[in-house]
From Swiss-Prot:
Catalyzes the transfer of an acyl group from acyl-phosphate (acyl-PO(4)) to glycerol-3-phosphate (G3P) to form lysophosphatidic acid (LPA). This enzyme utilizes acyl-phosphate as fatty acyl donor, but not acyl-CoA or acyl-ACP. SMART domains: G3P_acyltransf (SM01207). The chain crosses the membrane at residues 4-24, 56-76, 94-114, 122-142, 152-172, 191-211. This is Glycerol-3-phosphate acyltransferase.
Length: 235
């Protein structure tokens, strides 16, 4: 039990690192929550700080999810505080990742007002189901390029994830997932691309959560007032 608490607590603190707010303070001396959409995530960083800072914030937010779902769980598997929790591996990684997402959205370091959790949730899922997430990322990037609406891309990507898991698992009959091996710098690395049913259930919950956290964006889209991103506008 102590190990599970430690995993969730540290994952929350990692997710709570307010990357967007820190970038705004360092680059322009501002709180980006007071500008643009009023959000502390990567999307608003693109609008307020420019594409370079926005990309950096987004990548760091993604990294928080990967660290929680992969590195923190792996660390405590080898260094448990008491007994390691008897929980399905994918379910445990999802719990750790969700703790990081909660930290990102309700960050203790910035008055519990953070981002919307899309990038951190994406990072968590990259760590668990990288191949499925590559497809989702492709959908996200294509939608951003065509529409210039990051909010639309986030919503479509969230809806696509559980569908992709279901299609790969049941239509292509890939079972619980596949193991892949890559060679980098002369070393052989392996990783597992999970298709565990927990991912489908979780994906549906995330899709609903993304729709909820983007309700203001949806209202602006319907009224035609949603902000579009413009690449190259800022340096």
């Amino acid at each position: 039990m102590l190990t599970l608490i430690a995993i969730l607590a540290i994952s929350y603190l990692v997710g709570a690192i307010p990357t967007g707010i820190m970038a705004g303070k360092m680059l322009k001396g501002i709180d980006i929550r007071q500008f643009g959409s009023g959000n502390a995530g990567g999307t608003n960083a693109f609008r307020v700080l420019g594409w370079k800072a926005g990309l950096a914030v987004t990548l760091l937010d993604i990294l928080k999810g990967i660290v929680a779902a992969v590195s923190i769980v792996a660390f405590f598997r080898h260094h448990p505080v008491g007994a390691f929790p008897d929980i399905n591996e994918v379910a445990l990684r999802l719990l750790a990742g969700m703790s990081a997402v909660i930290g990102h959205v309700f960050t203790v370091f910035a008055g519990f007002k953070g981002g919307k959790g899309v990038s951190t949730a994406a990072g968590m899922l990259i760590g668990i189901a990288p191949v499925s997430m590559l497809i989702v990322i492709g959908i996200f990037l294509l939608t951003v390029y065509v529409s210039r609406y990051v909010s639309v891309a986030s919503i479509l990507a969230a809806i696509a994830f559980p569908l992709i898991i279901a299609i790969r698992k049941y239509i292509f009959e890939l079972g619980g997932g596949l193991d892949y091996y890559v060679k980098l710098f002369g070393e052989r690395f392996s990783f597992h691309d999970s298709l565990d049913y927990h991912l489908m259930i979780f994906g549906l919950i995330v899709a609903l959560a993304i729709l909820y956290t983007h309700r203001a964006n949806i209202r602006r889209l319907l009224s035609g007032t949603e902000n579009r991103i413009k690449f190259g506008r800022h340096s």
